[in-house]
Amino acid sequence: MTVTGIIAEFNPFHYGHQYLLSQARGLKIVAMSGNFVQRGEPALVDKWVRAQMALENGADLVVELPFLVSVQSADYFAQGAVDILMRLGIDTLAFGTEQLFDYQKLSRLYSEQAEHMTAYLAALPDHLSYPQKTQSMWEAFAGLSATGDRPNHLLALSYVKASAGKKLQLQPIKRLGAGFHSEAKDQCLSSATAIRKHIADRAFVEKSSPNAALILRAPQVTWEHYFPLLKYHILTSPDLTEFFQVNDELASRISAAIRSIATVDELVEAVATKHYTKARVRRVLTYILVKAVEAPLPEGIHVLGFSKKGQAHLKTIKASVPLISRIGAKPWDQLTQRADTVYQLGHMDMPEQTWGRVPIRPGAMN
């Protein structure tokens, strides 16, 4: 049987995600971001709610990406997620993309030319952002023209690199409906960005997600719920460079801006440059918020939920893969658990995110 992996955030789950799951083949394993997502933001609703949405729409197994995989640049995010999915026994990786290319061919190219492509990337001028450098590399080696604002395609190219040299079939699925960053409310398939933007519009959410009731019932948070704590950490930390990926320049820019701004968006605008993208700045601010430092990734894989098929699959691999189904006295990943504790502070009705939680099973009360 085909075992398909899907890397996702489902922030929140919408009809485009439902379509992606419907097109994936065989048993479907989702490696999903936890309570903080790749672009350096808190998820709108918590990881347990999002796992339930996935399971109700065709996923067979949902596992959590550790914090230092979830909140990373595209290449590290992709590599960490693919590594976890490979340990879970996938043979296919399905992903949405705005542009359909022969990604399998690109993966073979990278496996053969990785050293030269990496050297080319390193030689590009520093005034270019990493996404710009990556686009230039693929244009030079594979003839791919600049893709503009195509975040799913750019992430797909990171999956190409992460899958190079592995026995993994790539299944690109054409993205339908609104663009990734579109905030439009008049699209047939609205984006997660639009749902987050218009979350107060109940009718819009109800027409945009098959799980609208779950989304609307759950505690919802944004960056602004955490700004006072972020500001406190910035103002009271003696050395911001002790936190993950905070260099001297970023520390200086953040410290200089923090006293004169009133929101996270204003802080990001003040700190970002051509070299430091807004996404990178948001990730750095997330690291400061949760006091993240460099740490090894956990050996165990945290299971958020499963169907009957998913449970049967877990039984076939549990002897060779350390699976965590309940976090108790022994921690799974201390950094991810600290991030969960911070996340809980964002809303007075936010349920416990770690201790005593057990995997979700469709149709069963958690």
From Swiss-Prot:
It is found in: Cytoplasm. Belongs to the TmcAL family. The lineage of its organism: Bacteria, Bacillati, Bacillota, Bacilli, Lactobacillales. ATP binds at residues 7-20, 96, 152, 175. It comes from Streptococcus equi subsp. zooepidemicus (strain H70). It catalyses: cytidine(34) in elongator tRNA(Met) + acetate + ATP = N(4)-acetylcytidine(34) in elongator tRNA(Met) + AMP + diphosphate. This is tRNA(Met) cytidine acetate ligase. One of its GO terms (biological process) is tRNA modification. GO terms for cellular component: cytoplasm.
